[in-house]
């Protein structure tokens, strides 16, 4: 079976899946042909199990449909194709069952002769050895002090401060925000997988997903999770060397080491940690010397069994100016998206923050704020702080009327921002689907009807032309938008549910 057939079927699957699902589970797969067999490699056991359970049946169905009736022999393995650099398989997957099924030095193979119709699960074959990155003894660290903390752009107010100096060359103050823990991280559908993966790494350092790569927009909780991992590691082992810093701090330290002719001390320092947590890795883009040094540091840490966690504002392969070899290595572990929180999670975040501040926040007031502040958690918390301050200074209870007063300028700005993006986000939340579903080519009614509603709202509430609306809905033709608008207008007359949905969405977007 040709690799081209596989790629063709993957492209068909891309059209069926939300972008986040495709990027997380299908995109990391590598494939190579071996005679009549197609070998598909997953970067770790968790991805292998998930693909086997959720997507293998559909993939086999597509391969059967487009393979001219030939029954493909497919093996799903942990590892990478032989043309790629060898790497270690994870030792402790997220699921307990997977942990029992996979040994530290094994590959799990799933073989499935597929008929032309959908095949369900595949049988697990005898594990075969996989090439692992050599594990070396940890370097001597007697000359280094433990370091934990954040050297990020905004130093948290409440933190444990530690100053670290490396033989006169490197000296900087770091902060670990003790208020960022797993216990006060509000979990929702948008961050559920990221939270679970971070907990697995924190509870089983060096034996979970390495590296763990979290990506998503600003203010969505990536940094919170990194601090939570660091706090948990130090709770389990107070002597652990956990380094949390912004990528720009790494660059600054390297520059300082070069100026002081202390690059060897720099290397020894960063390669002697138990866990390296680096925020906003996209700032390494187009910094060739920094990327070179980080590449070798990254390799040394993984070979030594030390944990690495990275974050970025975008999928690693989409970071322009970042070397391909770094992008490839970032995919060795688990890459997870953190999406904007849905309405229920935003309400839960507000209620939790109010409880921490010992402030009585009525549920309807929290719902009012959450409906209007949808961009990210940081803006949501900022709005709540303004409301609490206004309530305190005015000596009044928090009500919707007080919220309107304290957030007057912000709400006025939101009223002006009835954009197509805003409409897509609101409609997706209302129907409990993903924004990527609205942009996909899926035609099931559960997706197609909300998509038509969103198009009709975009025509009514924005000044965009039909071609412009079609373009931001996955590159659709203007006739598709016109049909959607006509269809929704008809349904508003004949379908009470659609009429009520449209009215509710219109009210949410304009009040």
Curated annotation (Swiss-Prot):
Domain I is involved in oligomerization and binding regulators, domain II is flexibile and of varying length in different bacteria, domain III forms the AAA+ region, while domain IV binds dsDNA. Residues 135-144 have a biased composition (Basic and acidic residues). The lineage of its organism: Bacteria, Pseudomonadati, Pseudomonadota, Gammaproteobacteria, Pseudomonadales. Belongs to the DnaA family. GO terms for cellular component: cytoplasm; plasma membrane. Residues 91-174 are annotated as: Domain II. SMART domains: AAA, Bac_DnaA_C. Residues 175-391 are annotated as: Domain III, AAA+ region. It is found in: Cytoplasm. GO terms for biological process: DNA replication initiation; regulation of DNA replication. InterPro entries: AAA+_ATPase, Chromosome_initiator_DnaA, Chromosome_initiator_DnaA-like, Chromosome_initiator_DnaA_CS, DnaA_C, DnaA_dom, DnaA_N_dom, DnaA_N_sf. This is Chromosomal replication initiator protein DnaA. Residues 1-90 are annotated as: Domain I, interacts with DnaA modulators. One of its GO terms (molecular function) is ATP hydrolysis activity. Plays an essential role in the initiation and regulation of chromosomal replication. ATP-DnaA binds to the origin of replication (oriC) to initiate formation of the DNA replication initiation complex once per cell cycle. Binds the DnaA box (a 9 base pair repeat at the origin) and separates the double-stranded (ds)DNA. Forms a right-handed helical filament on oriC DNA; dsDNA binds to the exterior of the filament while single-stranded (ss)DNA is stabiized in the filament's interior. Oligomerizes as a right-handed, spiral filament on DNA at oriC. Keywords: ATP-binding, Cytoplasm, DNA replication, DNA-binding, Lipid-binding, Nucleotide-binding. Residues 392-511 are annotated as: Domain IV, binds dsDNA. ATP binds at residues 219, 221-223. It comes from the Bacteria. Residues 128-162 are annotated as: Disordered.
